[in-house]
């Protein structure tokens, strides 16, 4: 059995997450589901004993049905937010490593992913229209347009 790197203590929730930035033909890939009214980045919890790079490749394949390769680590994101949905009432703290994935030259996917029992859907959102969508993390709106060739550390407080 695999164990996620994270814990809950009273009304506090922490997770160590690996996530992907997948850009193809001017579009960035996000996930969504029928329970949430927003889009979120592709990725998930790192398992105990698993590297973040291994985790992001596993999560991308689980969610998209496609094997992407990692280009490089792009962002270290510390996110503080009030939980909703299954995390309702929780004070959440997430540390996520965002990896830029190597483009494949195709937006074709083979997704059959579920999260917490709900089917996930994949959405290609135009980079130049990202600010028109309720999509997380919000720093993607500015940072993906002019990505630096270095690792950036970002701290956000999102409610």
For each of these PLM feature ranges, what is it?
Residues 1-19, 25, 90:
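Acidic, metal-coordinating catalytic segment for phosphate/diphosphate chemistry
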Residues 15, 23, 41, 68, ...:
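Short connector loops at helix/strand junctions that flank enzyme active sites
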Residues 22, 30, 101-103, 124:
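Conserved hydrophobic "DFG−1" position in protein kinase catalytic cores
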Residues 24-66, 75:
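Conserved Nudix-box catalytic region and its N-terminal flanking loop in Nudix hydrolases
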Residues 81-110, 143:
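Active-site-adjacent beta-strand/loop module that shapes the phosphate/pyrophosphate-binding cleft
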Residues 100, 111-144:
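NUDIX/MutT-family hydrolases
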């Amino acid at each position: 059995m695999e164990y996620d790197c994270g814990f809950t203590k009273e009304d506090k929730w922490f997770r160590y997450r690996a996530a992907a930035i997948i850009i193809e033909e001017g579009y960035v890939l996000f996930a969504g589901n029928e329970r949430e009214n927003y889009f979120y980045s592709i990725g998930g919890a790192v398992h105990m004993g698993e590297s973040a790079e291994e985790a992001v490749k596993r999560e991308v394949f689980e969610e998209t049905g496609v094997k992407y390769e990692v280009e490089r680590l792009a962002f270290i994101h510390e996110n503080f937010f009030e939980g909703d949905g299954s995390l309702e009432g929780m004070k959440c703290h997430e540390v996520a490593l965002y990896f830029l994935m190597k483009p494949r030259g195709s937006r074709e996917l083979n997704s059959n992913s579920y999260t917490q029992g709900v089917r996930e859907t994949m959405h290609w959102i135009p980079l130049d229209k990202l600010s028109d969508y309720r999509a997380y993390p919000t720093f993607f709106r500015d940072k993906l347009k002019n990505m630096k060739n270095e690792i950036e550390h970002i701290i956000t407080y999102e409610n």
